[in-house]
């Protein structure tokens, strides 16, 4: 069972060696392989998630729980990662969102402000966490209270929220991905006659 990275490298190498066609190389790569090489991923964890919301923007992040724009900015200024939690976000939250490593909200879905803004920035996000209640100084989630400044983790690919730190593997994008995407562009142009 190949990782996404290995599958992309193997498929491109086989096509470059004329063992398979470029079309077969494209077909061999699953969309999940692309997610794996473009976004950070959470390694398997022994702990159960506190809650599962909507996987609104892929990737995973661990950092200090922040409940306001000011808290995010202070955390980042101190050289630490910030995860912004809110009942929902709006334009007034964008300075904090921009500096966060990840975003989580109680309300909203794939078309919510938090989801769209996070995807635009390439940040992981979990939205629509039904069990989440945000107060001025803490969150209540899945029957657990977590104070602002505590470690928390989100997985925007699965929608999971974990207390504490989880191990995250940074995206490892192979150089062969550029070749594969060029072949995809060529195949697309051939199909639509542009």
List the predicted regions and their residue ranges.
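Cysteine-dependent phosphatase catalytic core of the protein tyrosine phosphatase
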Residues: 1-74
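Acidic, glycine-rich flexible loop/linker segments
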Residues: 2, 41, 48, 59-72, ...
């Amino acid at each position: 069972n190949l990782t996404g990275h290995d599958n992309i490298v193997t498929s491109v190498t086989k096509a470059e060696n004329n063992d398979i066609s470029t079309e077969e190389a494209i077909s061999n790569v699953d969309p999940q392989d692309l997610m794996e090489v473009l976004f950070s991923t959470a390694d398997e964890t022994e702990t159960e998630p506190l809650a599962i919301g909507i996987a609104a923007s892929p990737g995973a992040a661990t950092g200090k729980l922040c409940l306001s724009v000011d808290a995010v900015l202070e955390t980042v200024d101190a050289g630490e990662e910030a995860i912004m939690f809110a009942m929902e976000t709006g334009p007034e939250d964008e300075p904090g969102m921009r500096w966060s490593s990840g975003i989580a909200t109680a309300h909203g879905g794939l078309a919510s402000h938090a989801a769209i803004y996070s995807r635009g920035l390439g940040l992981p996000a979990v939205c629509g966490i039904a069990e989440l209640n945000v107060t001025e100084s803490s969150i209540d989630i899945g029957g657990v209270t977590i104070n602002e400044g505590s470690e928390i983790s989100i997985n925007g690919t699965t929608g999971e929220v974990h207390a504490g730190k989880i191990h995250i593997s940074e995206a490892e994008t192979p150089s062969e991905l550029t070749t594969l995407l060029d072949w995809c562009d060529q195949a697309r142009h051939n199909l639509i006659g542009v």
